[in-house]
Amino acid sequence: MSRRKQAKPRSLKDPNCKLEDKIEDGEAVDCKKRPEDGEELEEDAVHSCDSCLQVFESLSDITEHKIHQCQLTDGVDVEDDPSCSWPASSPSSKDQTSPSHGEGCDFGEEEGGPGLPYPCQFCDKSFSRLSYLKHHEQSHSDKLPFKCTYCSRLFKHKRSRDRHIKLHTGDKKYHCSECDAAFSRSDHLKIHLKTHTSNKPYKCAVCRRGFLSSSSLHGHMQVHERNKDGSQSGSRMEDWKMKDTQKCSQCEEGFDFPEDLQKHIAECHPECSPNEDRAALQCMYCHELFVEETSLMNHIEQVHGGEKKNSCSICSESFLTVEELYSHMDSHQQPESCNHSNSPSLVTVGYTSVSSTTPDSNLSVDSSTMVEAAPPIPKSRGRKRAAQQTSDMTGPSSKQAKVTYSCIYCNKQLFSSLAVLQIHLKTMHLDKPEQAHICQYCLEVLPSLYNLNEHLKQVHEAQDPGLIVSAMPAIVYQCNFCSEVVNDLNTLQEHIRCSHGFANPAAKDSNAFFCPHCYMGFLTDSSLEEHIRQVHCDLSGSRFGSPVLGTPKEPVVEVYSCSYCTNSPIFNSVLKLNKHIKENHKNIPLALNYIHNGKKSRALSPLSPVAIEQTTLKMMQTVGGGPARASGEYICNQCGAKYTSLDSFQTHLKTHLDTVLPKLTCPQCNKEFPNQESLLKHVTIHFMITSTYYICESCDKQFTSVDDLQKHLLDMHTFVFFRCTLCQEVFDSKVSIQLHLAVKHSNEKKVYRCTSCNWDFRNETDLQLHVKHNHLENQGKVHKCIFCGESFGTEVELQCHITTHSKKYNCRFCSKAFHAVILLEKHLREKHCVFETKTPNCGTNGASEQVQKEEAELQTLLTNSQESHNSHDGSEEDVDSSEPMYGCDICGAAYTMETLLQNHQLRDHNIRPGESAIVKKKAELIKGNYKCNVCSRTFFSENGLREHMQTHLGPVKHYMCPICGERFPSLLTLTEHKVTHSKSLDTGNCRICKMPLQSEEEFLEHCQMHPDLRNSLTGFRCVVCMQTVTSTLELKIHGTFHMQKTGNGSSVQTTGRGQHVQKLYKCASCLKEFRSKQDLVKLDINGLPYGLCAGCVNLSKSSSPGLSLPPGASRPGLGQNESLSAMEGKGKAGGLKTRCSSCNVKFESESELQNHIQTVHRELVPDANSTQLKTPQVSPMPRISPSQSDEKKTYQCIKCQMVFYNEWDIQVHVANHMIDEGLNHECKLCSQTFDSPAKLQCHLIEHSFEGMGGTFKCPVCFTVFVQANKLQQHIFSAHGQEDKIYDCTQCPQKFFFQTELQNHTMTQHSS
């Protein structure tokens, strides 16, 4: 038995299972039989036939086998097999499939047999059917631990239970790309996608039916094989056997079977093969295929015209042409007693619901060739061959018969139950769509009669839906050829086509056409049009009634036209119009909405009694006494307009529909739109607000601007790394890479230095050689002459020897003297280009005449060269004689290297190395091609001329003034020029504090008092003219310039006779003038220096103690009669902070500061009889500035932050703290104790940098340390009291770190 995985078969949808997934159009999987575990072997199953024991893989295969092929099965009791029959949708059938009711079912009578094909995997029992086995397995609750919370079904695996729950929850994540269908499983979606495939490559060679798979075609061909072997006279295979060998119409090749002929045509003559999109037409005599109906008719007339085989199926009369046969068939439809049309009988009857027994009888088909004027009431897919009729409705034509069911598509099988028919339709005719049932109250579309009954009970509160439905008037139609009664024209049309059509396949595939007025049936469209034109458009005609009733009691069908189509098709029912709009205009609202809104042209329903009565009266008036109507006229039933052509009549009806159909307007702004889609887009704009957010890709946070997102990315998702360029290792902090460099790349290198001559050597061997040659050989003679290299034992000997090297060697060209001959020779070679092989006797005149002649010639040549070159050396600076220079004897150019000189001579004078310069001097001066326009000197290269021209132009000016754009050759000249642009030339006052500056020293000192003017990028700024300077030299130039311009200012006054007057100094408070600077006290207030007289200082002490004197400042005498009005007017004292000048403690108010001074610093309180201030023992810590770097060292207590100026005072102060408080200093943050405040402060620093990777950063200058105590030492040495950041709100103390403030608050102010 095969155990490979196979998808379970598709099945009809159970109406009671409301959480099923819809598969395909009208197909669903049963909630009980639906496969949940496609991946498990225990959930897969195979199907076997009970009669012949043949095994099948799907339910559709075994169903088709039992119906058509199995010789041991009757073919009508298939529904007895639960694995093949269709489950009923009634409540009783639901109980049978529920696992909770499985105990009451007798499914285990056959268990225990050793040969049964379905054994239980949990026990020894076996069963004959798979359904029995599934019911039995549900009893093993201990083996199936997972239970569905909806239907209590048990599962072995959790994934099976979860997949099953999706059936109840409706979780459908697999969507069809072609339509809006959704499925919970991918295999169901694959099955559904096959319905959208228009290409069916597998064609039946007999009936030309298409299939999606070869297996389906193989099963279909078995049906033809069974029919071929049987004794059916109407079989097409028998017809083919009776015929001669078939021949191809193209190549005259003969074939025994039609499938061989069709295969030959498809392969050899593809242009002659019928199109797959259209149904092929086959001749009833020779079975030749045709594409068009006209070709088939011409073929029958020409080839088979002599044979009278066009027989009538009613009277067996034969005709030569098909048209004659059609005319004869029309005569059969005329009644014998009258000349009226033999239309199908209309009987107003009620129908009884059969939902209790066959609720799924709604299997209907939508014919694509339906006549537009036919009523669109849902058609029944299964039709009855005989139905029980009452004698009042049908008269003698009614008869009692057993209810049987037959397929309307293949018309070959009879089924005893509707369930078997449903299985047949689902397995054999999957390509046929499904139709629904419509409620007569609210016109709601329902999938089945059972759902219709439930809808009537719940919505319309019907106690007995069967009685209500039967009481409702309905129109039924009776076939004139048999006793069949149907409920709509479409069903009657299918009945006539299938039961009373010709044997000709072309005639069978065509539709029967019914008149919408009298319901007369016609076999051709042309005959129907002729009938409407001749009968219903002629007032003289009297054929209007039914042949059964004999009186015009039938209501006139109202006409509805689609206004969205170009040809304006006409429909006689709103339902048909709605269906047309749904299929062809999906975005257009249905016409049913217009009827409910009261916008229909006629308010009465066509089936209502009032409408029937009114239309009947109108028709009677028209038939009886109305005016005569001309033939071929069309009269509008809305306005009475008459038209002679059908096109103009349809166009006129379209105008009525345009006025009836409402306009699509926006409920917000009343704007009109042509269709529903544009209206929906417009209305969405009213309810839509577009907001732009910028989302972080890492943490999904939203930001309203790009700047916020970039700031977030820089703060949270950006890391700065440090890469070592030596080993390419990466570090996350600066401290880490510093440690890495100190550990791995700090290589030790030893240098060996000689202590005697301070020479350095790389290794010890070189030092030993040096000592051997320089110190051992001349041992005892450590003093060496720098001129001749001779060594001496004592320094006195060396000094006596140096006197012998007096400058006795004089140069005969420039009169320079040298100590040694070698220096003179070097000077001659470098400066005068004299190369002598023999040292001349410079002290005597004993030189030979030849030597003197050569020297004279060379001297003359050099003199002439200097004169002709326009004093080239004069334009350049003198070269230092200590550096070796190589001069050109032609142009006088000097170079520091001999190779540069050789390159110059080769480039500019065409003199190669080694050639005699004296021989070519005169000739070389004339050969140059590049001539100087200034001095007429020639050069051999353009670069040489360019360098020479620079000597005439002067130095290159690379420095440009940023104010006026003038260029200068040096930075010094540019600085002196920039000062001339100053706007403060006549004042020497600081533009920030307005303090007068009298000298350059005061100017430079005052610039240091404004630290906010410093900038590490641009340098300093002058306090007088506010220009930016880049160096201290430039700042000094500014000071010199400004002090020279202000030399006749306010501080230095001159009389008319030019006599110098003594410099005066003013008090910054009372503006009194003093002749001596010592009479004023210099104060540093807010970083600015001020001068106050003694009286102002004394009075400001009593009113505002915050103004203090710096230590070491001179205290002049205090005047008793000095006024404070000027100081009060200026408001100088009011701007001082309330901070104690002695201990630098800040207070909130002046009263607290006064109390502090009276109690703590009594020695600073001035005595009324005293005229001088006392020098305080404790003074505030001054600001550290460049001008105050030489002040006294201060000491500050960590505990109370008092400042002392000597170590003894702070030691005594700390000892008092230890006596009062002891050695236990507790950290309030972690309850640790320390023996000193310094250790406690170091511990609090560690608290501040917890989680920072072991690094400690200074909060003031941001210097990084790896130890907390190093940071503590740095703070004490580099930063003072004024740099502390955190102030205590309850006392004047300040702290560097927040943890210090927290610990201080918890210790001192916790109460």
Curated annotation (Swiss-Prot):
Keyword vocabulary terms for this entry: Activator, Developmental protein, Differentiation, DNA-binding, Isopeptide bond, Metal-binding, Nucleus, Phosphoprotein, Proto-oncogene, Repeat, Repressor, Transcription, Transcription regulation, Ubl conjugation, Zinc, Zinc-finger
Source lineage: Eukaryota, Metazoa, Chordata, Craniata, Vertebrata
Function: Transcription factor that can both act as an activator or a repressor depending on the context. Involved in BMP signaling and in the regulation of the immature compartment of the hematopoietic system. Associates with SMADs in response to BMP2 leading to activate transcription of BMP target genes. Acts as a transcriptional repressor via its interaction with EBF1, a transcription factor involved specification of B-cell lineage; this interaction preventing EBF1 to bind DNA and activate target genes.
Disease: Defects in Znf521 are a cause of B-cell lymphomas. The Znf521 gene is a frequent target of retroviral integration in murine B-cell lymphomas. Involved in most B-cell tumors in the AKXD-27 strain. Viral insertion into the Znf521 gene in the AKXD-27 strain causes Znf521 overexpression in B-cell tumors, resulting in the up-regulation of EBF1 and the increased expression of a number of EBF1 target genes. This in contrast to the role of Znf521 in other cells as a transcriptional repressor of EBF1. Misexpression initiates tumorigenesis by perturbing B-cell development via an interaction with EBF1.
Record comment regarding domains: Uses different DNA- and protein-binding zinc fingers to regulate the distinct BMP-Smad and hematopoietic system.
Zn finger (C2H2-type) start-end: 47-67, 118-140, 146-168, 174-196, 202-224, 246-269, 281-304, 310-332, 405-429, 437-460, 477-500, 513-536, 560-585, 634-656, 664-686, 694-717, 722-745, 752-775, 783-805, 809-832, 886-908, 930-952, 959-981, 1020-1042, 1065-1083, 1138-1161, 1195-1217, 1225-1247, 1256-1279, 1286-1309
Protein name from the UniProt record: Zinc finger protein 521
Organism encoding this protein: Mus musculus (Mouse)
Localization of this protein: Nucleus
Cross-referenced InterPro entries: Znf_C2H2_sf, Znf_C2H2_type
This protein's record includes keyword Repressor: yes
Region (Disordered): 81-108, 357-398, 863-883, 1105-1136
Biased composition (Polar residues): 359-370, 387-398
